[in-house]
């Protein structure tokens, strides 16, 4: 996705106009415009100059972010988010208020409260009117932006919020000016009664008040919008500006842009680590809270990786740079949060559709309102006041901001806690999952076997047993051997030398130590050389039932004991599973392990269902079957789980560390904590609730406000002065943004208020997984080949694949962006229109289906 800065947008109608204009450019496959960040993301083969020209033709400005680079630097991105509007609006507001207060004194102070006026104005109604006109002109000149933008947009037949304000203020000013000239004529004729009548028709103060109040609203909105990007700007400020590198045997402090890959850099206590790297020398505790949300420092020593913007707290570190510039973990996180803000959530389509026709509809309603009241015999002033009220109370901004402000705050809050949502759609969909499928290794468990128990035989000490095991296992490459070596190292043991070492495939190990034959391995293997008591055999069976691997060791036919090794469950896994289940989510564990081990791990973790003995391609098939029963999130380490992560409705990569750009995942969790999964779902649900509240307020406000402004409730004695309409319009956007900012107070790790989602009833024809598999094999599959335009990368393939496989009749979809095709395997006939719609809803073009 190529990103652009867009200038000149003032409301949702503007962003809709830009999006529509760019989408028409040949070669553009998708376009998403963010009013909140004044940015635009474009995918496709169209040249940047063509896209910029299209934006300019629509009446707005555009520039390529980062001077053509795919990802702008942190400094450039921070500058783009800098709040330049609030200071300008503040100056405009102060000048406007100064003239408005004087205008209100002349127009209402003397008449309503008897405030004194200069003698010159006594009975000089024309002078009074001219003074009000000049003061109003001053306010209009100060706020000329509304008129320039509004009438230019109207001329281009793409009216926006500024158009409504400009029309309302112009109508009030124009009618008041007419009344002033008419009053002047009446005064020349000596018609005192007509003079007073026309003077009551002055709406100069309404025109000035409308402009001033809208400016108040714009300033509050700009200030609040600035706060929604605080999390993102906070991340950008973490980026160090300099680094201390070794050059020609000397330490030099250089700008961060000059650090290159494989440079050697040093970090002293209290300094921020400048780039991603690997520790060569030294040891320290590093605070990674800025990137992962982890409050406790992490110990680092030679061979460990470090990330940019984390803080070295205690020791001296000498490191080699591995990722610099835009490739660092921090830069990727910033880019991911920016991309999420630049994309649109599916729920935003409702507001987009309304925003596209909102302003023209409001203008039409205002015109009809004015005409109807005139036909009903009301005065021009009364009818015009109703029409102006309709114009100034209507607020497309509240609709346009309802979704993006909540997405920005939600994604920023997630980033601060080590939870990264790649797109707005992933932030929305995560909270809607019904089933969470968990990979076992590295997700539920630590992913590294550990010694859990030492069971020495009678007359043998634990140290003796472990020393014999160490002597055998030191030459083995087996993962279980590494667990024994780690335990021996922790206990301070050193390995004895052995000879005649042999590894017997599938059985165990044998070697000679000090003339004594050592054997180690499975019960079946060791029992051929040493006598194993029934009690020890029973203990081995019990260990196996618990999902542990019992390793037996003997010396010259004498049993030394048993060492139990297992991939242990992470401390937070059972609690995380409980939280998911309390949310009403079914938890399934997928693993390639044997049934017995898998059942033991599943029982310890507390999952609802265990599916064992599945390879990566088997996980893909299982996810497809699970999706028949609801929305599925697949949680894995992103290494061998890529097919399943892609197949699921939401792919969550856990423990990604520095690899935050995993293509297959929709959500990336920086830490290896399963507890971040319910936290991500909790945050998604809170964000979705916030969006619903914002949309409800925006629709409710306009649904109630427009009829009130039009005078529908006049028979009940309720009318709305245009000034109050402008005040309401100003507050509506402010309320929406303020509500979104409440998300910053949300405690995403607190399960206290978790609610269960209502699950969709299973369809009557949904068979159990085993029956479904049989049915699919019995049917002869049908295939269709789709020609698709607009796919550019593996991510495009994944998007199209997921869209097609969401159709119940589709068994599989093989997508190639290089060939521009999707080969769809069907279990039953499906209409071509359904296939086409699924792809084109994702903004790709279907050229044909065979």
What are these regions (language model features)?
Residues 25-43, 48-49, 202, 233-327, ...:
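Conserved cytosolic catalytic loops of P-type ATPases
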Residues 88-242, 353, 722, 748:
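Transmembrane helix-loop-helix hairpins at the membrane interface
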Residues 451, 455-585, 595, 607-623:
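P-type ATPase nucleotide-binding
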């Amino acid at each position: 996705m190529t990103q652009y800065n867009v200038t000149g947008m003032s409301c949702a109608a503007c962003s809709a106009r830009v999006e529509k204009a760019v989408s028409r450019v040949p070669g553009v496959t998708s376009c998403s415009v963010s009013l909140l960040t004044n940015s635009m993301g474009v995918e496709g083969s169209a040249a940047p100059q063509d896209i910029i020209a299209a934006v300019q033709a629509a009446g707005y400005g555009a520039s390529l972010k980062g001077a053509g680079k795919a990802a702008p630097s942190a400094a450039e991105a921070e500058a783009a988010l800098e709040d330049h509007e609030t200071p300008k609006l503040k100056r405009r507001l102060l000048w406007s208020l100064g003239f408005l207060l004087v205008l209100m004194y002349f127009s209402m102070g003397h008449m309503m409260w008897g405030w004194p006026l200069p003698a010159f104005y006594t009975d000089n109604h024309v002078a009074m009117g001219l003074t009000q006109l000049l003061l109003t002109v001053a306010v209009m000149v100060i706020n000329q932006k509304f008129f320039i933008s509004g009438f230019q947009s109207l001329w281009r037949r793409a009216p926006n919020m500024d158009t409504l304000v400009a029309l309302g203020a112009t109508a009030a000013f124009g009618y008041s000016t007419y009344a002033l000239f008419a009053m002047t004529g009446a005064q020349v004729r000596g018609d005192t009664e007509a003079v007073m009548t026309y003077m009551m028709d002055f709406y100069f103060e309404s025109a000035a008040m409308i402009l001033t109040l809208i400016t108040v609203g714009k300033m509050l909105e700009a200030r609040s919008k600035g706060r929604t990007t605080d999390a993102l700007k906070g991340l950008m400020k973490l980026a160090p500006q300099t680094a201390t590198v070794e050059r020609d045997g000397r330490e030099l402090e250089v700008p961060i842009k000059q650090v290159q890959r494989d440079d050697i850099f040093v970090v002293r206590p209290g300094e921020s680590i400048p780039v991603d790297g690997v520790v060569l020398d030294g040891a320290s505790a590093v605070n990674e809270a800025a990137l992962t949300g982890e409050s406790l420092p992490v110990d680092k020593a030679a061979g460990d990786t470090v990330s940019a913007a984390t803080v070295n707290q205690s020791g001296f570190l000498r490191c080699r740079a591995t990722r610099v510039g835009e490739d660092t973990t921090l830069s990727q996180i910033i880019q991911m949060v920016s991309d999420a803000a630049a994309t649109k959530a599916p729920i935003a389509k409702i507001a987009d559709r309304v925003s596209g026709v909102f302003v023209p509809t409001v203008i039409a309603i205002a015109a009809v309102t004015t005409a109807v009241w005139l036909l009903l015999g009301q005065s021009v002033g009364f009818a015009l006041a109703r029409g102006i009220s309709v114009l100034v109370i209507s607020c497309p901004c509240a609709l346009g901001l309802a979704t993006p402000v909540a997405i920005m705050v939600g994604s920023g809050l997630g980033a601060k806690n080590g939870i990264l949502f790649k797109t707005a759609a992933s932030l929305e969909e995560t909270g809607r999952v019904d089933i969470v499928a968990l990979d076992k290794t590295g997700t539920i468990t630590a992913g590294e076997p550990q010694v859990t128990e030492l069971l020495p035989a009678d007359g043998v000490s634990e140290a003796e047993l472990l020393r014999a095991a160490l002597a055998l296992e030191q030459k083995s490459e087996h993962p279980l051997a590494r667990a024994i070596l780690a335990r021996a190292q922790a206990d301070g043991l050193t390995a004895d030398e052995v000879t005649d070492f042999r590894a017997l495939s599938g059985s165990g190990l044998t070697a000679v130590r000090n003339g004594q034959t050592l054997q180690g391995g499975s019960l079946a293997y060791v029992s051929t050389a040493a006598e194993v008591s029934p009690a020890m055999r029973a203990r081995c069976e019990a260990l196996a039932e618990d999902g542990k691997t019992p390793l037996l060791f003997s010396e010259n036919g004498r049993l030394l004991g048993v060492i139990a090794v297992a991939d242990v469950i992470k401390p937070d896994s059972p609690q995380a599973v409980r939280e998911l289940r309390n949310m009403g989510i079914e938890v399934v564990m997928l693993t390639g392990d044997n049934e017995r081990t898998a059942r033991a791990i599943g029982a310890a973790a507390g999952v609802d269902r265990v599916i064992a003995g599945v390879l990566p391609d088997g996980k893909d098939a299982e996810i497809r079957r699970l999706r028949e029963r609801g929305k599925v999130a697949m949680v894995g380490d992103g290494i061998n789980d890529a097919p399943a992560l892609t197949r699921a409705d939401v792919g969550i990569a856990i423990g990604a560390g520095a690899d935050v750009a995993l293509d297959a995942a929709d959500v990336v969790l920086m830490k290896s904590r399963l507890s971040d999964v319910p936290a991500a779902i909790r945050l998604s649900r809170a964000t979705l609730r916030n969006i619903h509240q914002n949309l409800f307020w925006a629709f409710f406000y306009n649904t109630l406000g427009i009829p009130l402004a039009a005078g529908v409730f006049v028979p009940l004695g309720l009318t709305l002065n245009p000034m109050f309409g402008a005040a309401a319009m100003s507050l509506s956007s402010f309320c929406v943004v303020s509500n979104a900012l409440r998300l910053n107070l949300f405690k995403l790790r607190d399960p206290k208020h978790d609610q269960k989602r209502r699950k969709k009833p299973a369809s009557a024809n949904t068979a159990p997984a085993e029956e479904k598999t049989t049915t699919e094999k019995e049917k002869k599959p049908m295939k269709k080949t789709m020609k698709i335009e607009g796919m550019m990368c593996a991510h495009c393939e994944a998007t199209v694949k997921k869209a097609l496989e969401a159709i119940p009749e589709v068994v599989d979809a093989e997508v190639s962006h290089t060939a521009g095709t999707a080969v769809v395997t069907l279990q039953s006939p499906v209409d071509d229109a359904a296939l086409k719609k699924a792809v084109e809803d994702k903004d790709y073009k279907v050229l044909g289906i065979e």
